[in-house]
Amino acid sequence: MAKEDSIEMQGTILETLPNTMFRVELENGHVVIAHISGKMRKNYIRILTGDKVTVQLTPYDLTKGRIVFRAR
């Protein structure tokens, strides 16, 4: 997937699911399932409930996403 094809949105972690998946509520109120990107996994970035994150969504499936950034 090319970078310009993805949609980036801000969201908040609602709950942690198995296999490093998270339920994220986006700014517009939609709830999506997201997993951690490879660079975040490699650098051991920990994500907890309530964290503000940036999620990349693909235009093909707007119910799944990838967490690419955790706000401090």
UniProtKB/Swiss-Prot annotation:
One of its GO terms (cellular component) is cytosol. Its main location: cytoplasm. The keyword Iron does not apply. Transmembrane segments: none annotated. Residues 1-72 form the S1-like domain. Keywords: Cytoplasm, Initiation factor, Protein biosynthesis, RNA-binding, rRNA-binding. InterPro entries: NA-bd_OB-fold, RNA-binding_domain_S1_IF1, S1_domain, TIF_IF1. Pfam families: eIF-1a (PF01176). GO terms for molecular function: ribosome binding; rRNA binding; translation initiation factor activity. It is found in: Cytoplasm. HAMAP family: IF_1 (MF_00075). Component of the 30S ribosomal translation pre-initiation complex which assembles on the 30S ribosome in the order IF-2 and IF-3, IF-1 and N-formylmethionyl-tRNA(fMet); mRNA recruitment can occur at any time during PIC assembly. One of the essential components for the initiation of protein synthesis. Stabilizes the binding of IF-2 and IF-3 on the 30S subunit to which N-formylmethionyl-tRNA(fMet) subsequently binds. Helps modulate mRNA selection, yielding the 30S pre-initiation complex (PIC). Upon addition of the 50S ribosomal subunit IF-1, IF-2 and IF-3 are released leaving the mature 70S translation initiation complex. Belongs to the IF-1 family. This is Translation initiation factor IF-1. The gene is infA.
